[in-house]
Design a protein with these regions (language model features):
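Active-site neighborhoods of enzyme catalytic cores
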Residues: 1
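Catalytic grooves of carbohydrate-active enzymes
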Residues: 4-210, 221-223, 492-569
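C-terminal (or distal) subdomains of carbohydrate-active enzymes
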Residues: 23, 190, 201, 205-637
């Protein structure tokens, strides 16, 4: 965004450590390294190593470099980056590097089961604590609920611990001789989720007018008006009846059942204003609900699904791949590239023990309807990759641009999946686990010419400059990470296809290689650890075919909708109302967080669009004073 930040790069004379695949020669402040820096004119060279959280030779036995000063350059001082840049460095530079997310080169064990679980658990906790803070803010604002500082802070503490470096790079290592880092992440995120759930439950119990089961209260934790499906947990006994929902104008909304993990939920379409709420009456339906979304087998053996936005055709004879995906809102455009040898939603990877690539298209699949009603239709594709069973689900929702998908693989034994023939050596930068082309991928060959990749990053969207995402050495890493979403778009900005994931992982793409999502790697990993398959693999992902650019189609907001679904609860009889804490002109900004500090409500916003023109924020209420606050809490106005 043009903000300038003075930083310290890796110096040109700072070589990678010979025989290492994880650090540079700066790691130990050796005399040779420091003299190389001094000889090139660097007056106060730094070595970049953060003290670890749990190493046995940590601060209890002295600083990182230890007491043997003969091993490294002296004098050496320990500094924070802020202290170094302000007080020790020259403080200025003539360099003007325009930083990109693709300057961040991470080579973790993407696609392994342990990383999928860890990343998924962290993602759930990240979304949960932010929603909990927002719901707590509503409850304090409207009902005077005490701000649960200790519970919120503890939720953030355990979440931040789960984001620690060692959790992700050595998840199998034992923490203080007990549980592994991955097992500890499960515990840490469990605390965050439990605290978040308790905070939300406390908020909901205060916000609803009274106890009961006749009114549904719905809350929106985003700064955009929403008209979408919401799920409310209801008694199991209700399954014996059909139900309808009424808005404050008395208009009936159809409802549809969904059972997840043994919990009965009723889904209906709710219209809720920005940063606001709406209530609905729920009643038994007097008549059977008519009309369902289409899902039926065709005469040619294919299977067709349809909503008001999409027509989708599956081919059971080719493993249930999607042969056609037409977007009605994009003038009926066909998004599937049937000229590509890879199928759309095909699963394919190199199975080392079988000696070659295996594909879900090699065997026919069974397609069946799991859920069908007036609001959504969901089908299951059951097939095999070699001897291994898989189930893919696809859900189309009326009025919803997002196509929700899931894949579950039931493994037999511990198959090895990835590039073959690469013997692991710790000192060899060449590694089998880097090349995604050999991993089990879900392929999405898309009929888009002159493709350009965009991908989200923390408070940023990156326009990729990569010709492809492929590499096989530690010293040649490319940024192939999908945080929340990746968008493959046409360079003429006519259309695109966005892929969303439920966990941080890697994606694949190249000039002659379609967009694909990493589903599985199994084999040797960092430091020679065997990354095994020891349970079923299950991940969720989603697609949005769209016209125009990611920006025009508000893909960032679509991702936020997926991360923060509407919150709903049952309550007693009440006057049906709706309201909004604040509105932003044109729904221009994203609501990052809402927290109380004393009696002041701090609202953090983010502009994910390129439009930097001023926007009006309108607050509901008479006694409101707003001030702009910097991130370090300085009041600007």
């Amino acid at each position: 965004d043009g903000t300038r930040l003075t930083t310290v790069p890796r110096y040109a004379c700072e070589d990678l450590q010979p025989g290492s695949c994880w650090q540079s020669i700066s790691w130990f402040n050796t005399k040779d390294y420091i003299h190389k820096c001094l000889d090139t004119g660097i007056q106060h060279p730094v070595g970049m190593c953060i003290q670890d959280a749990a190493w046995s030779h940590g601060w209890d036995k002295g600083p990182w470099l230890g007491q043997d000063t003969a091993a490294y350059y002296t004098p050496t001082a320990y500094k924070t980056w802020r202290n170094y840049i302000q007080d020790c460095s020259v403080g200025t530079t003539q360099d003007d590097w325009h930083f990109s997310q693709e300057d961040v080169l991470g080579g973790l064990m993407w696609g392994t089961q342990v990383m999928q679980r860890l990343a998924g658990e962290v993602r759930v906790a990240e979304n949960a604590i932010v929603r909990a803070e927002k719901m707590a803010a509503y409850a304090r604002l409207y009902k005077g609920m005490e701000w649960l500082t200790e519970r919120i802070d503890e939720g953030w503490r355990t979440l931040l611990l789960s984001q620690h470096h060692d959790c992700w790079i050595v998840p199998y290592n034992q923490l203080q001789g007990k549980k592994t880092w991955a097992e500890t992440v499960t515990d840490w995120t469990g605390v965050t989720n439990q605290n978040s759930r308790q905070i939300i439950d406390n908020a909901l119990s205060l916000l609803k007018e009274k106890e009961g089961e006749s009114t549904v209260y719905v809350y929106n934790t985003l700064a955009t008006d929403r008209n979408e499906l919401v799920a409310v947990e209801v008694p199991v006994s209700w399954r014996n009846s059909d139900w309808v929902v009424l808005d404050k104008q008395g208009k009936k909304q159809p409802a549809q059942w969904l059972t997840e993990d043994g919990i009965s939920k009723l889904l209906f379409r709710a219209q809720v204003p920005s940063a606001g709420y709406a209530s609905y009456a729920i009643r038994k339906a007097e008549d059977k609900q008519s009309g369902t979304l289409k899902a039926e087998r065709q005469k040619d053996g294919t299977f067709r699904m349809e909503s008001d936005l999409y027509t989708l055709v599956l081919n059971p004879s080719k493993g249930g791949v999607i042969e056609s995906l037409k977007a009605k809102a994009v003038r009926g455009k066909e998004f599937v590239d049937n000229r590509n040898e890879r199928g759309f939603n095909e699963l394919r990877g190199y199975f080392i023990d079988e000696g070659g690539f295996l594909s879900s298209m090699d065997q026919p699949a069974e397609v069946s309807v799991l859920e069908q009603g007036p609001l959504f239709v969901k089908v299951a594709v059951k097939g095999k990759i070699g001897k291994y069973s898989f189930t893919q689900t696809i859900r189309l929702t009326q009025g919803e641009p997002r196509i929700d998908m899931n894949v579950k693989l039931d493994w037999t034994g511990n198959p090895r999946i990835g590039e073959p023939g690469i013997e692991f050596r710790a000192d060899n930068p060449r590694k089998a686990f880097y090349d995604d082309r050999y991993k089990l991928l879900v392929y999405l060959p898309t009929q888009i010419a002159n493709q350009q990749i965009y991908k989200d990053a923390p408070f940023d969207v990156c326009e990729s400059r990569l010709e492809n995402t492929f590499f096989n050495r530690w010293d040649s890493i490319k940024h192939n990470i999908i945080l929340n979403w990746v968008d493959v778009a046409s360079k003429d900005n006519s259309c695109g296809l966005s892929l969303f994931t439920d966990h941080t992982t890697s994606y694949a793409h190249g000039k002659d290689f379609p967009l694909a999502l990493n589903v599985q790697y199994a084999g040797k990993g960092l430091w020679g650890r065997d990354y095994i398959i020891d349970r079923p693999t299950e991940i969720s992902y989603a697609l949005i075919p769209h016209a125009g650019t990611w920006e025009k189609s508000r893909i960032w907001t679509q991702s936020e909708r997926r991360n923060e679904p509407l919150v709903a609860t049952l309550g007693g009889d009440a006057t049906l109302t709706s309201g909004s804490l604040f509105r932003i002109e044109n729904n221009a900004y994203e609501l990052v967080s809402m927290v109380y500090k004393g009696n002041d409500l701090y609202i953090r916003l983010f502009n994910a669009q390129s439009d930097a023109s001023p926007k009006t924020i309108t607050f509901q209420g008479q006694d409101v004073k707003a001030s702009l606050v910097e991130l370090d809490n300085r009041l600007v106005e």
